[in-house]
Amino acid sequence: MCKDTYFSGEAIQLSDMLRAREERALRQLHLLKEYPEGSLLSVTMNIPGPIKTSPKLLEAFDIVIKAIQTALADDKICYQLRLLPTTGYEYYLITSLPSRDLKLKMIALETELPIGRLMDLDVLVLQNDLPHSISRTVLGGSPRQCFICSKEAKVCGRLRKHSVEEMQTAISKLLHSFFNKDNQSSSSDKTG
């Protein structure tokens, strides 16, 4: 397994990331105002460091998007948008499903899918005319765990407990394991 397989994309600058965050917040606000009766799902990847995109990261992203679409197959989807900027992949979906129910489905998906941990599956609502993310802990879910030490991810991030190199190595191992397991099941399906 080579880390470069997963982190082979274009390096970005902090200013690019800040601009992308601002644009994402504006897009979320616009969608929430355009679809006031719907629930907004905003999907991005948790990728540390200056490289946010690569063919393998896109493959993982698209697998999760397909899983989301499958999980919501019985619900009305009003709008979808998939963006592929170098600052990180983005996906937006508006559904008629109540936001609480949507968040519960996304928590389940994030937990069931081995690469779900790489995603931010944010369900947003308008609060005081601004996008507000529904927290998994408000719905009884446990806080996200760190890829490396299994402690609370926000604490590790705030303290910069792990280097970018450590986190990229952990993500590479997770993806390598996922893609190899997936290929093995595809091979056994064909031979069986």
Curated annotation (Swiss-Prot):
Record EC number: 2.7.7.61
Pfam family, one: CitX
Reaction catalysed by this enzyme: apo-[citrate lyase ACP] + 2'-(5''-triphospho-alpha-D-ribosyl)-3'-dephospho-CoA = holo-[citrate lyase ACP] + diphosphate
Gene Ontology molecular function terms on file: holo-citrate lyase synthase activity
Protein family (similarity comment): Belongs to the CitX family.
Known function: Transfers 2-(5''-triphosphoribosyl)-3'-dephosphocoenzyme-A on a serine residue to the apo-acyl carrier protein (gamma chain) of the citrate lyase to yield holo-acyl carrier protein.
Protein name: Probable apo-citrate lyase phosphoribosyl-dephospho-CoA transferase
